[in-house]
């Protein structure tokens, strides 16, 4: 994500203004805040209570249906130049649902952006950009946990996984953005419904 959007991220960092309400960098920080707070407060609860097949089935099914519903409701009027603090906070609040096993971070943030009136392309782009600070927090948290649990961390394995993820992301993001812009989110919603059925059967 960082590599693909490197030019966008350079501009975001360069133009970061904490006093300009439509500033994209500020709005990405605002959108990250809810999951940072919720993740810190609920991590142990989620680990102990929500990692079950039933939870994964229902979240997979529900967010698939909501993705189709929000795609059909989308009015495609706003772009990222019109992003507001209110919208960012709402999108970030939706992102908290990504903490529930079976949900998708990108799906819930795209759903929120669509319901707020953003174009399909900009909903997807904001979701991808939001992944940068969000996944940085997740990676940092996991790294801290690993360092506390064991001194035998395989940095080779971490590097290998990161490299595979990097190559996969580069090959997929461009295709996904073009696909979403032309087709929308319905195929992804249908995929989640079929996946929920697979989970239920097996």
Where are these regions (language model features)?
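Multi-pass membrane proteins that catalyze or facilitate reactions on polyprenyl-/lipid-phosphate substrates
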Residues: 1-202
């Amino acid at each position: 994500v960082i590599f693909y959007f490197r030019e966008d991220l350079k501009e975001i960092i360069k133009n970061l203004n904490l006093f300009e309400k439509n500033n994209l960098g500020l709005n990405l920080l605002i959108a990250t805040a809810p999951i940072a707070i919720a993740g810190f407060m609920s991590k142990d609860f989620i680990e102990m209570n929500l990692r079950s097949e039933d939870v994964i089935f229902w979240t997979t099914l529900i967010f698939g249906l909501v993705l189709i519903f929000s795609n059909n409701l989308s009015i495609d009027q706003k772009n990222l130049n019109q992003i507001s603090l209110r919208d960012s906070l709402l999108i970030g609040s939706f992102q908290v649902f990504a903490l529930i096993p079976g949900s998708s971070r990108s799906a819930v943030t795209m759903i929120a952006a669509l319901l707020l009136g953003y174009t399909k392309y900009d909903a997807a782009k904001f979701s991808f950009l939001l992944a940068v600070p969000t996944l940085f927090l997740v990676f940092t948290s996991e790294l801290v946990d690993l360092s506390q649990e064991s001194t035998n961390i395989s940095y080779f394995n971490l590097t290998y996984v990161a490299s595979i993820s990097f190559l996969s992301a580069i090959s997929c993001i461009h295709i996904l953005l073009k696909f979403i812009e032309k087709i929308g989110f319905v195929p992804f919603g249908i995929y989640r419904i079929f996946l929920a059925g697979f989970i239920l059967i097996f």
